[in-house]
Amino acid sequence: MVALRSLFLQSVWNYETLQGVGFAWALMPGLRRLHPDPARRADRLLAHLELFNSNPYLSTIAMGVVLRLEHEVARGVAGAERRVSHLVGVLRGTLGALGDELVWAGWRPALGAAAATVALLGGGVWVAGAYWLLYNALTQAVRLRGVTAGYASGAGIARVLQDPFWRRTAAATRLGGAAVGGAALALGIALGHSGGGWRGAGIFLGSVALLGLAARPLGSGGRRLSPALAFLAIVILLSARTQVRAGTAP
């Protein structure tokens, strides 16, 4: 239920707490179990209505950690409340930076470039659908797994996130995306020379611009729009390739 509620993390985004309202709302099912007393539950809910801003997919890791530490709060462990507040502050920055590298600068542009390359090589309309499915398959799996991973790690999550594996993975994804993007660019140029003319070149460059825009960090609203921009770019590329093959581009 917490992972499902995290889908609405940014629904009540505001300039005072950013994602704070959505974060606290997502925690409600867990807080309801841990704190049966309504007054105590309300007190703990208010404690989480503070500034929170992180990657929307990795934020569920923080939710799992918080619920694990809320067990200690419910048992009355000394200093548990202060420890929860401190760890949330650490995690929002750490998960935000890691999410930017893994998702916004890594997985999304790499997958978009790969889909564009397959489209130029002759893939059908299914390429756009495959891009959409693969992007969401990974990101939503991370969202779902994040709650249980965070809960299992508890306060030890800091050591897990400091593992160089995450940075190496992000760097490898960016490098792979750049290589595939270069291949897509070369194929697009070849497509234009094979008969696409100015119209084919214009369509191709417009598609590349959309893919580039989709790969940029555009703020909370833009990030939700970016996968759709990449999807649109892939569809346009498919259309351009079809027109060039049919000889309709002057």
Segments the model singles out, each with a brief description of its role:
Residues L210-I234:
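Interfacial loop-to-transmembrane junctions
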Residues M1-A80:
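Soluble N-terminal domains of membrane-associated systems
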Residues H86-A119, A178-L185:
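Transmembrane alpha-helical segments and their cytosolic interface motifs
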Residues A116-G129, G188-G197:
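Helix-coil boundary and interhelical linker segments in multi-pass alpha-helical membrane proteins
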Residues A80-H86, A149-R167:
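Juxtamembrane inter-helical linkers in multi-pass membrane proteins
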Residues V235-P250:
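Juxtamembrane boundary at the C-terminal end of a transmembrane helix
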Residues G124-A158:
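Conserved mixed alpha/beta catalytic, RNA-binding, or beta-rich assembly cores of soluble enzyme
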